[in-house]
Amino acid sequence: MTDAYGNDAATSTGTIADTTNNAASGAPQRAESTERLARPLIKLAKACGLATSFIDQLGTYTEISDAALVAVLKALDVDASSDEAIVRSMTQLEVENSKRLLPSTIVATTGKPTGITLNCSSDADITASIELEDGTAFGHFALLPNLNSGKPDLTIAPDLPMGYHTLTVTVDGREGKAAIIAAPARIPVPEAVAEHQRWGWMTQMYSVRSRESWGIGDYGDLKRLLADAAEKSKADFMLINPIHAGAPIPPLEPSPYLPESRRFLNVTYIRPQDIPEYATLPADVRAQVDALHDSVAARNDESTPMDINAAWEAKRPALRLIFEAGRNNKRELEFEHFKTTAGPDLDSFATWCLCFEVWGAPWGENRWFFEKTIDDPAVRQLVEEHHDLFEFNRWLQWIAAEQVNAAQQEALDHGMTLGLMQDMAVGVHGLGADAWANPERFASGGVTVGCPPDFYNQQGQDWGQPPFNPRYLEATGYQVYREMVHSMYEHAGAVRIDHVLGLFRLWWIPQGLGARNGAYVTYNHEAMLGVLAIEATRAGGMVVGEDLGTVPDYVRRILADHGVLGTDVEWFNRVDDSPNAGDPYRAPKDYRKQALASVTTHDLPPTAGYLNFAHVKLREELHLLSEPVEAFAASATAERTAMMNRLVENGYISQTVADDVEGHVQEIVEAMHAMLTDTPSLLLQAALVDGVGECRSQNQPGTSREYSNWRVPLADSSGHVVHTDEVFDLPRVQSLSAVMRREKR
């Protein structure tokens, strides 16, 4: 997640502070004092995975307040409310650790031996077994005493297959189990990508519509976009906005980065006409469906902000008509198979949807979210009374999965190397399906994720999303994360992880303390990277991590070692990572090879707009500036001048063009993309908005209702709507495609 200048909101604070005390040297303090480290609260916090200090973006050492530490510990169900409580909690933690025979989760690297020290005496009566993911036994391990510790070491042989396995250890009749995540050391680069650089498009799927759409872009449009992008521009992938599940009925949240569930799909993007049963509807029912489509179809030609609620209010009853028409035996069996495979989480999601529809949106005066659990008798009765509606919500997920799969298959059939690149949001809505059905998976007490203060957000940011509880993830072998990642690769050839630093740590904000008063909570990045490696390898796919902003070097190094591509954006890629507008930009040869390189992101105006300072004008209009507009405009001018200098220096444009940006916008946009093609980056990306000459922003960070975020339809430089079936025939898009193919300089 980035601000308007590409600084990663939650990563802009730099690094967690080194605990080595150097205050006595006379240098500015950059570590915790010996006295602070000796405090019981600090010891307890560190034992529970909290960073008790950090270095901010300015390089300033910052200590986490006691109030924040106590509140975050409470969210982890650890009581630190008093000195006595801290002692009790630390004692309880030590007792739990002493009783645990082995870790709850073990990360193994395939091809290498894995060693685990058991928490027992070597003289104990010990038995062990490993059950592989397929249910068979794996006996290639050894138990040997460790003479130094007096505890036994269990060593698993390097031929442990990739996958999710279970280790069971019995010591003197006491049993312990551990989930084993056996992953390759590195996600392999698909052969076609390793052979030579590949490029693709980025688009907000909902913004590109056809005459068959229902006011917003849908999975039918996505299918056509992928096919035409492959055939007419020779692109190898398309990155789209997150398509996680939203609310079942209006009001719908427009931001795709604030979903109700990351496990399931957004059903508002379903194309009713592409459902097989639509073709066999009785004439009168089909006429009703068509009439509902016609009631919103005229909006497909409008360039004004889209009305996603109106679109869904027309589409949903049409889908209900198709659902009620029934299915033949073959299709019914396929639906039953989908429900069985999706498992209890599908039932939980459908139940939340049902509660939302019958009892109302779970905010304001509606208290069911807080007063009813999924096991509540009233909830079970609701499902019984409205089982058809419950089944309808499960059916919608099946149809959505079918249509996304069809889009991905269309991409591959037309020659794309990767096809669809899905975007994984950071988290979910605090009142959404995931948080209600499975509260134990998340931090308790209203804690949310955000970022501490930085250059551009002096009060910090609160994204309003509850974080995963790392203790729960560890205790359950990361099952929920495994299922989420697996479901994404079912429909994609690559996954982009928004705010990839979240695999390592997240800024937790206790309710009522404000974004300034949070604390970093660390996560087992090796476990989650292991899951990503397994799922990507099985799918033959790739992983891209959004690592914009001030990300610690060790994080980028670990991600690269695991085969996760970074993200390089031209507008943010200055020499020595300088944050100062006007400082020189990197030469293309200095970009990372293991990266997805692009000119822009969805948080910036399209490049044509950025070159014309659309971001300055918009921020001034919305009163978002914390400095005089003249100062912000001067900074933007210096930034543009520095980019023109880089383009001139490397021969992409002449000085004459650089001196007249407004008169050569398309030429400069293409020059910036030509510079991309001279980088060593494995993947390159062009934004479809840059292809058509759009100037309007899809999203303005720092706003909610002040701007039409995530509702701007695709239009050209003249403001005319561009439809799905014509976009890749436009001369401007064809020209940019030729640049990306290195056929035009």
Where are the predicted features?
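Conserved alpha/beta catalytic core and glycan-binding cleft of carbohydrate-active enzymes
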Residues: 334, 547, 551-695
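Substrate-binding/active-site clefts of carbohydrate-active enzymes
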Residues: 417-480, 484-487, 491, 506-522
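Conserved, mostly hydrophobic/aromatic
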Residues: 45, 165, 229, 352, ...
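Acidic, His- and aromatic-enriched active-site or binding-groove loops in soluble protein domains
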Residues: 254-281, 434-459, 518-529, 564-576
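Hydrophobic faces of well-ordered beta-strands that scaffold small-molecule active sites
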Residues: 199-203, 236-240, 420-422, 495, ...
